[in-house]
Amino acid sequence: YSPHALAAKPRDIFPLDYDTLPAALPGQHHYLLACVDNWAANPNNLGNTDGVMMVTFDTRAKRLLFTTFMREMLVQRPDGGIGRITYIAKNNGVEALARTISTHFGVKVDKYILFGMDNVQKIIDALGGVPITVTNEEADYLNRYRIARNATTPSMDKAGTYLFGGHAAVIYMRIRKVGGDGDAGRNRRMRTVLSTLAQQYRDVTLTQALAVLSSVTDNLCNTNMSMNDMLQALGYAMQVAGATPEGLQMPPDEAMEPITYADMSTRQVDFEKSRNDLQAFLDNSFVVVDD
């Protein structure tokens, strides 16, 4: 990280016009998943959305894409002011968050599901946990955090692969102060967990898929998706089952600049570069695959 630029005022931000955003590419279906930073989410009094991800099912190219969004970036708020993206849903609602992602990144995503951390924990438990390979530093952090001895199988010790229960997986996805890559690390860990779960369901049957869907619908805080929308999304997911998940961080590191704004550590973003990179990822003219 470079020293924070002490700018009196961030650069102006010019979002795109929502109503003239292009239609999704043929076969691509986007859904926004957001997780608030408390265990029990209250739809009428939301916390900060610390985890925001766009899931894309590309049924034409048989691709499964996870695009995560950095929590510290500055965006134009619905009132025209500038603020961190993590406060948009709390202050303006989840529709406003989906709209903000759409207009800043140039991809219209209007269907969303919002979770609390307890929802994510229950869903991962319902799916039988998730195998995760951790570094020594991550293992130390999880032990210092005092996750229960039975939170992973075997009990967390040092670097290696463990089966994580839901609670431990949520703590893992929230790690920020390990490895020196801050929020980028947190974004990467979110993509790792989702990608691993997807790969566990490579050969999913309809019965299993419906069980996964009911674990989601039983454990969400807020959504604008009808049951019909959910079943449609499940159909798309089954069409791309078996695809190797691809992940992208938005904005990319090189399109962000640290800036202290309103006494907060934030990131000023080159949205034009970000939109071009995201478009290229969706166009598949080049593919960025997480390690």
Predicted regions and their residues:
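Non-catalytic, solvent-exposed segments at the cell envelope interface
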Residues: Y1-D291
